[in-house]
Each structure stands twice: as C-alpha cells, then as structure tokens.
Amino acid sequence: MYKRQVYGVKYAPVDYYVALIGVWEQINKRYDNEIPQDIKKICDAYAAGINKYASENPKIVRSEIFPLKGKDVIAGWMYQIPYLYGIEKTLSKLFKKEKPVFSSDIILDDEYNFDPLKIDLIGSNVIGVGPKKSADGFTRLLVNTHQPWSGPTAWYEAHMKSENGLNITGGLFPGSPLVNHGHNDSLGWSFTSNSPDLIDVYELEMNPLNENEYLFDGSWKKLEVEETKIKIKVLGPIKWTINKKIYRSVHGPVLKQEHGTYAIRYSGINDMRTLEQFYRMAKSKNIEEFKNAMSMQALPMYNTGYADKSGNIYYVYNALLPVRDNDYDWRGILPGNTSNTLWTDYIPFKDLPQVTNPDAGYFQNCNANPFLATGFRKDISSFGINETAGIEGHQTNRSLRAIRLYGGDSSITREEFYNYKFDNQYEKNSVMAYAIDRFIEDFKSQDLELLAAVDLLKNWNLRTDLDNRAAALAILTFPLTFDIADYKHDVDHITDR
C-alpha cells in the first residue's frame, strides 16, 4: 500500500520517489538473502506490535495500510536515509522548468539565495569530556541533537531491554524499532548533522536517434526502463491510476526534463543495512565494538561523539565519502559520458577525520568543521580525503564557544559542564560579531539618535541575555550587514580573524 492510495494526490511525489530510487525492487530481490536473521526478527516483531496496536485502536489508524510487514521497516530506512542528507533538494532543483545551478560557490548556488532572518539553522551539539579534564575524574557526554517537535524526524524516547543483551535508552525516529542514539549500560553516543557532498548529478548525452540511449565511454548504452503504476485516491474509494516510466543509467536514477536528461548517484545507494548498524551500535560494550559497528558505513552521514564507562571518548566525522577524481567540479553538474566520473568506491572508515582520547581531554562538534574538534588540528587524523569530499570549512558560533569554554578549562566540574552548555554569548570571531563590526566601521551618519544606537552596538558584550538591549539591536541590524559570503570563510580565516 502506498501513501497516495490512502492520503491522496499530494503524496504522489513521495511514491514516485520510492519507485525512482528502487526501494521495493531492491527489497524484493535481496531482503531474504541479505538481511541477517536477528534483524529480520526485530523487524517482524516491530511490525507485529504496530499491527496489534492498530487492531486494538481501529478508530485512530488508517486500516488501509495494515498489516505491516518486516520488510516495511527496512523500506522506511531506505526511503529516509537519502532524505536526511538532502536528496529532495537535488530532485526539487532538477524538476524546475529551467536548468538548475549546482555550484561549489555558495554565492552562485541558488539554494543559498535566502533571507538571513529566515535561515533554518541546524543546531545540534555533541561534547565529550574525559577524566583528565574533569574535576571529579568522571567522563561526560553531552547529547544535544535538535529535532522538530513532531513529524518523521522527531525523537521519541524509549528504554529497550531484551533477553539477548540489549539494554539501551535514547531517541528514535518514528518507524524505527531501535534506539538511534543514546546510551546502554556501558557507553553512549550522539550525532550532529554534517554536510559532506554525498550526491552527484550527471547530465547525459542522449542519442538523437534513440531517446532511451545515452553516450558512455564512446558507445551508446540503453537506459533501463520500467513502468510503475501510481494509484491515487481521488474521492472515497475512487482511485485514479497514473502510469509513470522509471529510468536508470549506470549512475543511478534518471530524470528526463525539457532542459536535459540527468542521472543521480548518491552515497549508500541501494544499501539496506542501516538498521543492522544501529543494532550493532546498541549492542556494543566497548569502544572497539562500537568502532566495528560504525565501520559498516551503512549510515552515510552524521558527526558522531562517543564516551564510555572506561573513560574513553571518541569523535568521528562519519560520512560515506566517494573516492572521486579530483579533476572535476563535483559540486556542479558532471558529464555523464565518461567512466572517469563514475565512482564505485568509498573512503574507508579508518581514514575519516577522527580522534580517540585526544590530548586536549575533550572533543566537540556543533555542526562545524571536524578538524577543529579539539581546537587543535594536530589531534585529528585522516587519510586520502581531498576537496571533492565537500567537508565543511566553517565554524559555527556554538563550536567556537565550545572550544573557548570546554577547551579553556583544565578542570571542569559537573556544574560547569552544564553551565557551559547553556552559554548564550557570541564569540569575538563569529559571523555575527564580524558582520556587526563591519556595520559599525561602514556606518556614516550625523543623526544623534542613530549614533547613539551605533554606540550601543560598539559596547555590546556579545551576550544575549533577555534584558540585553544591544543584543536585540544587533540581531535586528544583522540582516542589513550580513553577506552570504560570511558563511564561506575557511577554517583559517575564521579562527585567525
């Protein structure tokens, strides 16, 4: 059963997306042979529990979608994971009437043409402090992901315990039978969003004599073509069926538009193992087992912070980074006529930016560059990663403040650990402070009232307490002086200015 059959025409694009990326094609081919038995049992048990709830509460569920099966759980993850790192934005741009601009230049990429007052900033934080930096010798982990209050990416809290050793509490997404982040009786972990380049768009050179052939390495190749039936609920029991062709090339799903024919390739394409990785993480009892679970690389993104009862702390810029040819602009639209742009391998997990038990005694990530997780580049190891990975070059104010507070205190008490988390100050080299300083420098006026306001900004202590009039004025002034290029600064520029 598909969403548009139950909820109507507005969900037809969702079902088209499911068909486009081949969710059910892959599951029907591979589920029985490739999903481990312990994961199948979890999926089946979860589906049975949902079905039981539905049977006992028929007035508050849509009976058309039941009964659920274990396969539906895996399908949910295959559907959701690419969404979590932005595939819907890529598809939306390709569906526009005019050819879209994909660019490594933040100024040119039309995704960033926004009003600064309407910026929807991602705001998760993870901070680990080890025994050597704690006043009482304890190890602490700040789990502070910021999710919506409702919807498909809202956290639901649960404590799960089983006879085979699972004992974990934490947050999970709707549709997940397992905790996605939290802690068991030995260790804990948390995520923050990162934004590596995990999606590539290729423009295909089509055969003028055959609309379903494209040029690849000097010869014409046929697109794979299948027809999917999209049934849409119109009124009551009345349904309308749309026949839609789905195309695929060697790269992945293909979209035929008036402004061109495009293929999409994304990290973790056709991977069904995400739930298995979460299970292995939840069952881990020490840092080695946790790293082994993470090395499955079935979760293509998220900064991950870890701490355990033995006093270990660990940070990794988790990302399924394709091994790409450095001669191409991977943020733009790529030529689809050559195997030089068709990646098939990924950077190994051990080579990702990461640090175990850093000399600094702590780590932090607040949606920022991974190489300053401790404030010192020398602490973070990585290998074989180049600019094609698209790793963030910026530092958020939260990250700068975490480095200042947690990094600057050699003996952090329990109270200080909590107080630092609720810090409400801008750092001197934050984008906000930089923009306001520029405004003050450039401002010219003889108006005494305006000059008084500027003087208020000059003396702002960068705090945002409720009674701080300068903070209110700075926030209102920010759109006047903000430049999107401020977010383009690399780490050296941000940390040095």
Predicted features along the sequence, with ranges:
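A terminal-accessory region detector
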Residues: 92-109, 328, 447-497
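Substrate-recognition/specificity elements adjacent to catalytic centers across diverse enzyme folds
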Residues: 3-152, 161-165, 169-178
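Gly/Pro-rich active-site capping loops and adjacent beta-alpha segments
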Residues: 3-9, 19-24, 188-239, 341-398, ...
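Second-shell loop/turn segments in exported
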Residues: 25-41, 265, 275-281, 385-392, ...
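Stable alpha-helical elements in mature extracytoplasmic
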Residues: 23, 39-49, 274, 290-293, ...
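Terminal end segments
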Residues: 377-379, 383-451, 455
